[in-house]
């Protein structure tokens, strides 16, 4: 019978292999973008010239998109706009794979609920995803505090370079994941089953904050719940 630790190692191996594939995807995509920019820059062009993306150009040409040639060359630069969009999209996809698939697989392997599985590195990636999805890729003035990543993101437009992408995947392959499980005690599990939907949400939201869980901070609503449950049991 495979031990829990072995099961987790197998799952992590699958995750690492999948993430490595995304590194290759990023490498080939950004390399191609950069080479296309160099090719365009070597061709004679004017400030007003446009470049088109078309299909079946020899027999039945169809034009699908256009942009100024000079703008395209600029956006094709190494760590330029096009490459930045690729790296951001891949990071969002990688987080989704962790959150929707691999975290659940690990939880099943160790016999707990996925919400009790924590990974500091993926917590850092979640912050990046939040900026991309909910803040239009704009880093707030206060910046971002990471637990594992050593990135110093300036406020303003979020830019994820090729080198940063590699650093992230190196952390995945190294000791950066630091996966841990924080299942509630049997007593707390019993109490959770007696909470109202509103109480449970308040409890779970409170302990979603890493410092509260790590420092074993008491949930402010605990005494009120204990009192309510006690009164119900006496009645």
What does each of the following model-derived ranges do?
Residues 107-115:
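Inter-helical turn/loop segments and adjacent helix faces that build the functional surface
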Residues 62-71, 95-107:
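A short mid-domain helix/strand-loop element embedded in enzyme catalytic domains
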Residues 83-103, 122, 126, 130-133:
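Short, hydrophobic, well-ordered secondary-structure elements
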Residues 1-85, 116-120, 127, 143-235:
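Extended intrinsically disordered or low-complexity regions, especially N/C-terminal cytosolic tails and loops
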Residues 102-107, 130-141, 177:
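Charged/polar positions within long, soluble alpha-helices
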Residues 51-57, 89, 93, 134-138:
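Amphipathic, heptad-repeat alpha-helices with coiled-coil/zipper character that mediate oligomerization
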């Amino acid at each position: 019978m495979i031990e829990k630790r072995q099961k987790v190692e197998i799952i992590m191996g699958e995750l690492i292999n999948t993430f490595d594939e995304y590194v290759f995807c990023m490498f080939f995509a950004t390399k191609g973008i950069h080479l296309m920019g160099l090719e365009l820059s070597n061709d004679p062009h004017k400030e007003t010239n446009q470049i088109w993306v078309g299909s079946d150009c020899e027999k039945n040409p169809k034009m699908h998109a256009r942009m100024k040639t000079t703008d395209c060359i600029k956006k094709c630069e190494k760590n330029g706009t096009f490459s930045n969009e690729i790296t951001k999209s891949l990071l969002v996809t990688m987080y989704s794979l962790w959150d929707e698939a691999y975290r659940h697989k690990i939880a099943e392997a160790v016999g707990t609920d996925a919400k009790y599985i924590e990974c500091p590195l993926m917590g850092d990636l979640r912050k990046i995803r939040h900026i991309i999805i909910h803040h239009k890729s704009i880093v707030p003035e206060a910046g971002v505090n990471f637990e594992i990543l050593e990135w110093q993101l300036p406020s303003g437009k979020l830019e994820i370079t090729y080198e940063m992408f590699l650093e992230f995947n190196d952390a995945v392959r190294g000791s950066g994941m630091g996966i841990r499980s924080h299942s509630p005690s049997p007593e707390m599990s019993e109490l959770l089953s007696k909470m109202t939907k509103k109480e449970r949400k308040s409890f779970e939201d409170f302990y979603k904050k890493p410092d509260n869980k790590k420092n074993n901070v008491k949930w402010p609503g605990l005494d009120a719940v204990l009192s309510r449950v006690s009164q119900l049991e006496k009645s």
